[in-house]
């Protein structure tokens, strides 16, 4: 199916809306922002540095604003396809509560503000990584990959995986192998998380013409790939212990969480879509959100114990 035409969105690009503060908050994708902030904070805590608390606070706020800027620019560009998807039709731009031009200006301002603040208050390596993250998510993923390939989530997942690296760099002025392991955990987690969603929202993506894996390769192939990635997720989760920058206690927690992730994925594979309500797919999607918060919470606790003692 062809992508929805953007012309009707362009016609309203210059008008002013009567948006509320709540609409602009929604434009920032606060749920996504919360995950970005949390993983970035974990990267900051695990980094071998002792920054001033004020620097840490400003850094995490700048990263949060940068994440919100990405969300605003994504909603600006994707308003045409959001309008025809039941899951996203109520977002501020397609619903007409915020004009496209306002969303664009808001996103650009927040992007510049967040990058500039992080550069001036922390260091320009972290600011450059934040700028790259915003660019990659908005231009590479949103404007290109999302509408052109079923590998959109795989490649585009790099943007969502970078926040802990940005947080680490903000504290140390460098990028380390440990921070890249944090990146890897999120990068490998992204495909099974979003493909589980795509399996029970397949009609939405098909109507919008977005080439998600189930629409392109079929549901059976998607289930096999979900399972394969889930095994990799489980392995990546224990790497911090294997590499010596997390404790055996963390490793045990990560292993248990990873086994559960594989089990949920196996249920999706074994069900073969025969459950009309797609309960295994919905269960995996829900657990995947819990998994990422839990694995980074375990890393955070481990890092705090290491830093301050038991």
Curated annotation (Swiss-Prot):
Catalytic activity: heme b + (2E,6E)-farnesyl diphosphate + H2O = Fe(II)-heme o + diphosphate
UniProt enzyme class: transferase
Subcellular location: Cell inner membrane
Gene3D superfamilies: UbiA prenyltransferase (1.10.357.140)
EC number: 2.5.1.141
Swiss-Prot/TrEMBL GO biological process terms: heme O biosynthetic process
GO cellular component, one term: plasma membrane
Protein name: Protoheme IX farnesyltransferase
Native organism: Chelativorans sp. (strain BNC1)
